Structure formats: structure tokens, C-alpha cells
């Protein structure tokens, strides 16, 4: 399935039906009086967050969504039928913006969340509503109100527990493929990964979601390369795993380049917990490895972990470190939520070790 994380769509709710001008006509009843019914209400346009979707690709082929109009009122005080609603089904994590692409309307962060984007127009009153002591036979009725129309932007920010960041060819996709059932494209050239990939990792019977985004390069926050476009997908993560390839000539520069881009990106990524790991260590001898590990430790001011997705070395330790941070943050979130006033499979242990080789505003419908 192709990945699309931004879409522009046009929505229009239904017009209300017109009220009817009608008079009661029955045998032997000379002055039956008005009996025009009201028009039906136009349909609404709703958005709903659903599981099982991780792309907005459906909105590439359909950009116009229109609810149906309410039917007109009829004689004998019959009210017209309401128009049918239209619901846009989007992945959990989708944000809805106004046409300016900056004003946030709603953030769809939980499964089943619904929000009304455009309300249908009310139906018009039939002439029976306008009967009075001074006007026993009104010959007019109200037209239905027009529905709302607008252009909106849908922007998807995937919800994952941990995000993988690093330069191109740092081994992020290889890591994701090794610890989850995800099968991202892997090749020995930069920007093999062109869109984010998600996978579910399991360690010690605990599951968490990993997000792999395209590699970052210097100047990414200014639009250089493609990684900056996808940084929004790791904004919601609880921890970042920063991979630095042992094949880099200068591992310290490789680390600081990405760290600078995270800091320059306006999304609070520099404040997230970070685990640093020297990847692809199977390609170096022991002396060279020690030298690069020391340089990386000096650059990041913490002891980096060492991993090889090919041999499996250090992979379990990294997963456990990620799990510990995620569990700690989840516990903090749960505690924070509990203090608020209430309002209305793929296991690494099973992987063979090779010595060589390769997350409506529920507003009910009215």
C-alpha cells in the first residue's frame, strides 16, 4: 500500500429542505387551514478515527465529500426526510486543519473518536407554523438553510512508542526488520527508505510500536533531503533511538548533524528521551570499534550502546532499554490522567544468532 500523509479535501454538508405551502382540502371542510410540513435537515459531514489504517492514500482518489440535502416538507403536516450524513474515515493520529493549513480544527488521537466538520442546514418551516389569529391562511413558508462548505487539510502523524532517527544508511530499516515483522526496503544506498514504516516489537512479553522514518541530512529542517517532511511522525513517540553507523568516517559529526536537525525542528524532539546506539558494529575490528565508541560517547555525553542487526549482538539490550523508557512514560501518563478531574510478534529471543554473514471529541449526532 502506498503511503500518503497529507491530503486536501473539499467538504459540503447538505442544505435543509424547504417548508411546504399547503392547505387542508377535504370534503365538507370549507376552510381547512394551512397544513404545510417542515423541510428535512441536511446531512452532516463527520470525521472518524479508525484502526487498521496508516495512510491517507484513499483521499488521493476522492477529494470531494458532500452530504445529501433534506427533502422538502409536504402537505398534511408531513416533515421531509433528513439528509444522509457523510463520514470521512481516517487513521488514528490524523490532524484536521483549516484551508490555511495552519489552524488546527481537531486532532484525532483515539480510536472511535468522532467530530462534526460541517453541520447540515436546518429545514424551513412550513406555512402551518405561521398561522395566527390575524392570518388564518398564510401562503408562505421558509426555505431551508444552506449547508456549510469548506476546504480542509488532513495531516497524518503516526502514533508510535519509539522512533528511529539517524543519517541515511544508519541501519534503521535493518533494525526494524530484525526486531519486528515489518519488511521495509533495504539497500546499500542513501534514501532507500522513502516513507515511514511501522513495526511491533516484542520483548519480555511486552509489545511496543517502532516508527522508522527516512534518514536526515544536514539542512533537513530547511527542506534539504526528505527526512524533515516525516519528522512529524516521531513527534508523538515516547523515546527516540538514535542510530549512528560504525561505517561513518566521523561518528561524532554524524551524531551532531542529526541532533542539530532535531533541535532545529519545531516539534519538541530535542526534549524527548534519547537512546544512542552505534550500529553495524560487525564491520569493524575491536580496536577501530573502541576508537569510534569513545568518539561517539564524547559527542553525545552518554554511553552509547552497540548493536548489529546482522549478528544480533546488543539488540535485546537496546529493546529492553526502549521498553523501560516507554513503560516509565506510560506509567507517568496514566498517573497524570488519574489525577485529572473526570469530564463529560516477533520476539528477538526467537531469532537465530549468526556468527557470520549477513496512538469525538465524542459529540453525538443530533
UniProtKB/Swiss-Prot annotation:
Positions bound to Mg(2+): 173, 193
Record-linked SUPFAM superfamilies: Obg GTP-binding protein N-terminal domain, P-loop containing nucleoside triphosphate hydrolases
Quaternary data: Monomer.
Entry EC no(s): 3.6.5.-
Region described as Disordered: 333-366
OBG-type G domain span: 160-327
Localization in the cell: Cytoplasm
UniProt-listed PROSITE patterns: G_OBG (PS51710), GTP1_OBG (PS00905), OBG (PS51883)
Record NCBIfam families: Obg_CgtA, PRK12297.1, PRK12299.1
Keyword Magnesium assigned: yes
Protein name: GTPase Obg
GO MF terms, alphabetically ordered: GTP binding; GTPase activity; magnesium ion binding
Recorded name of the encoding gene: obg
Gene3D superfamilies: GTP1/OBG domain, P-loop containing nucleotide triphosphate hydrolases
Composition bias, Basic and acidic residues: 347-357
The keyword Metal-binding appears for this protein: yes
Lineage: Bacteria, Pseudomonadati, Pseudomonadota, Alphaproteobacteria, Hyphomicrobiales
Domain annotation Obg: ranges: 1-159
Family: Belongs to the TRAFAC class OBG-HflX-like GTPase superfamily. OBG GTPase family.
Cofactor(s) required for function per UniProt: Mg(2+)
A Gene Ontology BP annotation from the UniProt entry: ribosome biogenesis
Primary location: cytoplasm
Binding site for GTP: 166-173, 191-195, 212-215, 279-282, 308-310
Function: An essential GTPase which binds GTP, GDP and possibly (p)ppGpp with moderate affinity, with high nucleotide exchange rates and a fairly low GTP hydrolysis rate. Plays a role in control of the cell cycle, stress response, ribosome biogenesis and in those bacteria that undergo differentiation, in morphogenesis control.
Key words of the record: Cytoplasm, GTP-binding, Hydrolase, Magnesium, Metal-binding, Nucleotide-binding
GO cellular component, one term: cytoplasm
Amino acid at each position: 500500500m502506498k503511503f500518503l500523509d497529507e491530503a486536501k479535501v473539499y467538504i459540503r454538508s447538505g442544505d435543509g429542505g424547504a417548508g411546504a405551502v399547503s392547505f387542508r382540502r377535504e370534503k365538507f371542510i370549507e376552510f381547512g387551514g394551512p397544513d404545510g410540513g417542515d423541510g428535512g435537515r441536511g446531512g452532516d459531514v463527520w470525521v472518524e478515527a479508525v484502526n487498521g489504517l496508516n495512510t491517507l492514500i484513499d483521499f488521493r482518489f476522492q477529494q470531494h465529500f458532500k452530504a445529501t440535502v433534506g427533502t422538502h416538507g409536504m402537505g398534511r403536516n408531513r416533515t421531509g426526510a433528513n439528509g444522509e450524513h457523510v463520514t470521512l474515515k481516517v487513521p488514528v493520529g490524523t490532524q484536521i486543519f483549516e484551508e490555511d493549513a495552519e489552524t488546527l480544527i481537531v486532532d484525532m488521537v483515539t480510536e472511535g473518536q468522532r467530530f462534526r466538520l460541517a453541520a447540515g442546514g436546518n429545514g424551513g418551516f412550513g406555512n402551518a407554523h405561521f398561522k395566527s389569529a390575524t392570518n388564518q391562511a398564510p401562503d408562505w413558508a421558509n426555505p431551508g438553510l444552506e449547508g456549510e462548505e469548506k476546504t480542509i487539510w488532513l495531516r497524518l502523524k503516526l502514533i508510535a512508542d519509539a522512533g528511529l532517527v539517524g543519517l541515511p544508511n544508519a541501519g534503521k530499516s535493518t533494525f526494524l526488520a530484525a526486531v519486528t515483522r515489518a519488511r521495509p526496503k533495504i539497500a546499500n544506498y542513501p534514501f532507500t527508505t522513502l516513507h515511514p514504516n511501522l513495526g511491533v516489537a516484542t520483548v519480555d512479553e511486552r509489545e511496543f510500536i517502532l516508527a522508522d522514518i527516512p534518514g536526515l541530512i544536514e539542512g533537513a529542517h530547511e527542506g534539504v533531503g526528505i527526512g524533515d517532511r516525516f519528522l512529524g511522525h516521531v513527534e508523538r513517540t515516547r523515546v527516540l533511538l538514535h542510530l549512528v553507523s560504525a561505517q561513518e568516517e566521523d561518528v561524532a559529526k554524524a551524531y551532531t548533524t542529526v541532533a542539530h536537525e532535531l533541535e532545529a525542528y519545531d516539534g519538541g524532539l530535542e526534549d524527548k528521551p534519547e537512546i544512542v546506539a552505534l550500529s553495524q558494529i560487525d564491520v569493524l575490528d575491536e580496536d577501530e570499534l573502541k576508537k569510534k565508541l569513545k568518539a561517539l560517547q564524547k559527542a553525545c555525553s552518554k554511553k552509547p550502546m552497540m548493536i548489529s542487526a546482522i549478528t544480533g549482538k546488543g539488540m535485546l539490550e537496546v529493546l529492553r532499554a526502549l521498553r523501560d523508557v516507554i513503560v516509565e512514560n506510560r506509567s507517568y501518563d496514566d498517573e497524570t490522567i488519574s489525577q485529572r478531574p473526570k469530564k463529560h510478534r516477533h520476539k528477538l529471543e526467537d531469532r537465530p544468532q549468526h556468527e557470520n554473514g549477513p496512538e469525538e471529541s465524542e459529540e453525538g449526532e443530533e
